[in-house]
């Protein structure tokens, strides 16, 4: 080393020494304290500020007082003049108290997921926790970012989704849809996604979900289609769904007369007088005469749709058109001349002609003329347009709509459905119209239909435009079109949108000379309604509420104010004042802005409920009741106010003078006066010189000639009741008074021409003939008594004829409509099919069991049965339906039971549970379809295949998780480890000293050898050899399996483990090849002995270096007991009492044992210490004692030569042990382990095979059907009762039951036999063990458990419980007696009783009322009898008749009294003396005829003419009177001569 290098080395040593001196002394084993963390500051990475509440204490000062008394000297007290007194003193001092308050302070901490390390400014290290990372993020402790996110998520905690669609649209051709953690591509309609999941391919749009069409899809192009409906349907507005066309819309449903839609089907009806033909379409005339429906008194003449009654000669047809009356006097038909003055129909009455109008017309005020009714004013039918026609109206629709099938509503016409409406590309249907549009890259033509590419040359907008000749006062200015294509960076979409906006050249006309308007014809002088001229004199400045060029238009709806620029804020249909904007609310709505209310047609708290108020009516906000406009009323505002009522709710009474008023306005109550009257209430007549309605017309009569105030005619004033030039004509019908100028107010009846008193026609009464006759009266003056009409019929107040209710006919309405007819006068034929019964009044069909519908033509829907399908089925929901007639449940596949409430028994499925399941290996069978649900470990249609290798569990969906090539259990996935492996996943090798399957075998390896974990082969430690490593290496060999040869020379011995040579004295070297020289041997090797036991002599020190297991100066002593190895430093681990080898540590086992822990007995064939001796036992199966080597027979053998096996039932050494195997199992002669026979398993064969298993060790699976067991030995199926077949796959045949189906069933009357035990399940109506007994009276149904509910001694059908009604009753429970007019079984018999007599509902016998008798009560009581059955006799004097009902005597004229035994009193006459005489002059009247018997010179019919003779007061006359009388007063004789005295 050079001097320079030595100097440098010395310098480094000095520096190192200084460093070591300067370092603090740290004791050995002491820990270094952690470095403090830097304080966190705002703004540092991952530092979060948090608020926390802390208690802060502080001292709060308070003033306190202390009071006490002090002694003081006081003067003037006591005998010494001084004394000691006490005074109170108070001392104030300052105290403090501790006060705590809660304060919030900001604390800086590491954000969640981060922590701070020493010397870090902030929180820079990740801190992992279970809930730190979201969406499957992985936390890496100490990393720069706490969470490592999976693809699709980002953020420090993976809390944010990555929107892949933001970058290049995610690679999608059409649409990119972002999803949490991923994304997906979608295609536009008409395309489908390609296999790359990014590009889109065009598809046949009809092939995908039928194009969304409900019926047919018609492909137009590869991406466009059109929906089409089946015949009888039409396309809805959505272009996809179809609705059924009204069957009446097409040719009136093929009906001749009327077509009605009933439950979606066309139902033809005929007018009155016609009946439906057999084809259900045509209408045939009903021959009322032949059917007996006319009820004409004399003759009947059939006409089309009606009939006409005719009378015999000398008779005239009555007003009812049926009765005939003898002609007593000449009757003039008031309708023969000029149709009675009627413009349409005329009917002759006793009061004169009665005018009638056809439908759609009404009588005018003259009661003669028919005027058309404006049906559009009252009809709520038409939705859009209503056109009134004479006698009717017609609905119409706006352009773009068509009339609905009901003739009222309007449907939008889908113009796009037909050739796309003429659009070249796309057509969009709108309400009442349509709109064409173009695809991308095209623009719409001027015709608004065609499309042209944007690449087409544009019109040269900069070219010369055609010259336009200016109009007078007009200048034409042309605007330049903005440049179509600009250079600025505008997106392609905006460019295209701009181009499709159709830029066109515009022209603007400018008026000159202060004119304006479209033709420059207006000036400021034309401004109206307060409008002023604008400053430029080019228009009008309109005031509030007005708009338009000249302010002649009111503001448009929903605007108001100046220039109509303000929007109204009125809600719920309110209208606003065009000037002020104030809201006018409709009925039912209030508030400043009409906010307290709902829009038209809705109500409720949230205005979500619908109401249906006609005629623009609104409904109550809360209750939905209709709030009608003035003039309307009714539940739905569909009625106009009655006469002389008006206003909201028709609550106001018109104040018009009714006789002078034509009508009263229903809305505001204003009066429309009749001709000749005027005034607000029509209270005044016309002033002179005026006439007509309202008196607005001026008369044109000459001066002095009166003018008729009604007609304006000139003429003289005729007396009341007359008119004409000479006042010789009576007032025409309907007028009265002076000049017949007043109109009768008699409701169409005539009135007295002078007084105006009404002459009411038959059936009317009252001052104005507005009242009908009272109940029970008819005719003129309502003087006639109505006949006894039956069945709630009333009599016609005009004719007295009974007006039958629908369903009844006859002169007294006593007959019910004949079968097959119903309605008024029984003129409509019933349409009930399938044995349905027709109600005689309404025609409503009462359907037979199993049928329903208007005409009983529709079978019961699923879930209902019985008459009119009125009974709900009592079958388990969804598991079965019931028979429409009987109600018995018809079970769906997979269900049985009376209500189909039970699933098929195990092993059966399908309809009636008649099919056998074919599932194997214990799989569950679906009771409906028979589909197999495989248990874990099996797959296949019938679960016949085990799981493939590597899979297990249900449907073999789970993959095995075993290592080392181990297979897994197909059921639970547990690993089946191969030999040498163990653990749940077979990931562990066998522990030491074990090998084989499940490491269950013990290794037979000794002297520290290891064994192969698979087959147990020993791997010997160095120095040992042999199968069990029991043999030490022979001399000259060492190492593994003693394969190496020793190299020791000169008598040296080698270590059998390491091969090291132990040299004899005088020799040294690795192979003892060197001879020791005197100078080479140090003191330790000086002695002749040298180092012993293989010890080596250290050439430097001369000390012996002892090998393992030896100690001492010359290595002469082995290790002390309990120690071994190098320097005897290792402690032995042998069991107590066993020494260990001082070199290897191997335990020195007692004779007969071996192993590292002496835990194993000597292997067979060896014995003694270390099992080193070999047994020398003779015989075939010997065994020697492992310790002593004494010979004996091996376990399982006996005999002198050990050649005999143990007899059955014994095992072990000397065959001394008894076997414990059951069920015929045999045991191993050596170990006693049981070998079970077929069908058994267990340690002692005590267990039979579990259900479903059989064979050796129960390894085979039974193939029997569910519910069947199999023989555990042979696998033969043991069928349960009711099953048969090799695999019990068949049920018993009919009428067989029991085990093997060997027994015959004994069920009768259709009873079902239980296949298992033969018990009978009786059908409805039967009971008993063998179903041999019918249900007793009063019981029915299954097992006769139900009680009949039939009344009136009726019986019930034993199967269904249907009541069998006795005569006179009907109904489901026979609870109703026959209706009046019917009797007998089923109430089919018709009663023919007359005069309103009822009949007995059972026998049909007529129960005659008092006054009648006979079989049909057709005869009245004979004279002299009365009462019920006419059995009572009259008690009247003089043969006077009596009332046949009451027996009261009907006295003849001149007689009275209870028995007609009294003469009439003076002044009375007639029948029963009920009339009063009208005789004057003291005359009496005849008590019979009432004729007056004059006295005292009176004469005349009433004796009021003439009187007694009086003498004159003149004497001359008196004197003459004594001689002769005037000639005129002389009495004459009968012969005409003078009377003789």
From Swiss-Prot:
InterPro entries registered for this protein in UniProt: cEGF, EGF-like_Ca-bd_dom, EGF-like_dom, EGF-type_Asp/Asn_hydroxyl_site, EGF_Ca-bd_CS, EMI_domain, Growth_fac_rcpt_cys_sf, LE_dom
Per the UniProt entry, the glycosylated residues are: 252, 739
List the Gene Ontology MF annotations in alphabetical order.
calcium ion binding
| SMART domains hit by this protein | EGF, EGF_CA, EGF_Lam
Q: Where do the EMI domain residues begin and end?
A: 44-125
Main localization (coarse): secreted
Q: What residue spans carry the region label Disordered? A: 1509-1541
Is Cell membrane found in the keyword set? no
Which SUPFAM superfamilies would you find in this protein's record?
Answer: EGF/Laminin (SSF57196), Growth factor receptor domain (SSF57184)
Matching Pfam families: cEGF, EGF_CA, EGF_laminin, FXa_inhibition
Polar residues bias (residue ranges): 1516-1535
Which keywords does this chain's UniProt record carry? Answer: Calcium, Disulfide bond, EGF-like domain, Glycoprotein, Repeat, Secreted, Signal
The transmembrane residues are none
> Which residues does the UniProt record annotate as the domain EGF-like?
124-159, 161-201, 206-242, 238-284, 285-325, 335-370, 375-411, 412-452, 516-552, 560-595, 603-638, 736-770, 783-814, 822-857, 865-901, 909-944, 955-987, 995-1030, 1038-1073, 1081-1116, 1124-1159, 1211-1246, 1254-1289, 1297-1332, 1345-1375, 1383-1418, 1469-1504
Its subcellular locations are: Secreted
The record's disulfide annotation reads 48-111, 77-83, 110-123, 128-139, 133-147, 149-158, 165-176, 172-185, 187-200, 242-255, 248-268, 270-283, 289-300, 296-309, 311-324, 416-427, 423-436, 438-451, 520-533, 527-540, 542-551, 564-576, 570-583, 585-594, 607-619, 613-626, 628-637, 740-751, 744-758, 760-769, 786-795, 789-802, 804-813, 826-838, 832-845, 847-856, 869-882, 873-889, 891-900, 913-925, 919-932, 934-943, 999-1011, 1005-1018, 1020-1029, 1042-1054, 1048-1061, 1063-1072, 1085-1097, 1091-1104, 1106-1115, 1128-1140, 1134-1147, 1149-1158, 1215-1227, 1221-1234, 1236-1245, 1258-1270, 1264-1277, 1279-1288, 1301-1313, 1307-1320, 1322-1331, 1348-1356, 1350-1363, 1365-1374, 1387-1399, 1393-1406, 1408-1417, 1473-1485, 1479-1492, 1494-1503
The leader peptide range reads: 1-30
Kindly list the GO CC terms recorded for this protein: extracellular region
According to the lineage, what is the superkingdom? Eukaryota
Q: Which PANTHER family match?
A: MULTIPLE EPIDERMAL GROWTH FACTOR-LIKE DOMAINS PROTEIN, PROTEIN DRAPER
Protein name stated in the entry:
Multiple epidermal growth factor-like domains protein 6
Taxonomic lineage from the root? Eukaryota, Metazoa, Chordata, Craniata, Vertebrata
Designated gene of the protein: MEGF6
